[in-house]
Design a protein with these regions (language model features):
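The feature marks the mature, well-folded catalytic cores of soluble enzymes
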Residues: 1-160
Length: 160
């Protein structure tokens, strides 16, 4: 088993912005005053996304890019690692998300597409039912997985 992968899932941003539902519980997200319009920010985010995909491919990383669903207007869709993880044994885990808006990012069509491409899906563990009990664990946005030593590390937060 390896600690890192040569395969990445990326979701192309259709509506990139800060998320008012999650800003209070995300240390990396800040509301800033900007002279840039939302459209300027979206164009910049998309440009940076495409540049990153190019760099990753140049390093022989296999990239699976999916378009966000525009009508959902998901500001965080670029971070699929919060709703899903893929494991070498063929297990896919779907995580419970605190923000109702973020729950619309969870997409079985992506998992089906990946399983028909080259990723073996043996089983899906769907923990999203825990949202009803207000229990959340937002994937690798909440925890760091040490895959070699089979450990997970996390800090306590409203989303872990």
């Amino acid at each position: 088993m390896q600690q890192v992968t040569k395969n990445l899932l990326m979701v192309k941003p259709a509506f990139f912005s800060s998320n008012p539902d999650t800003i209070s519980s995300n240390e990396f997200q800040h509301q800033i005053e900007s002279s840039f319009s939302k459209n300027d920010i979206q164009i910049s985010a998309l440009s940076e996304f495409l540049q990153m995909a190019t760099v990753l491919r140049s390093k022989n990383i296999n990239i699976h890019i999916y378009d966000d669903i525009e009508e959902h207007r998901n500001p965080d869709a670029i971070f699929p690692n919060n709703w899903v993880t893929f494991h070498e044994c063929g297990t896919v885990v779907l995580y419970p998300m605190m923000s109702p808006k973020r729950r619309t990012e969870r997409r079985l069509d992506i998992i089906k597409s990946l399983s028909s491409d080259d990723y073996f899906v043996r089983n899906i563990i769907d923990m999203s039912y825990l949202e009803k009990e207000e229990h959340y664990l937002e994937g690798t946005g909440s925890m760091v997985l040490d895959r070699v030593n089979r450990r997970a590390y996390a800090c306590l937060s409203s989303r872990t």
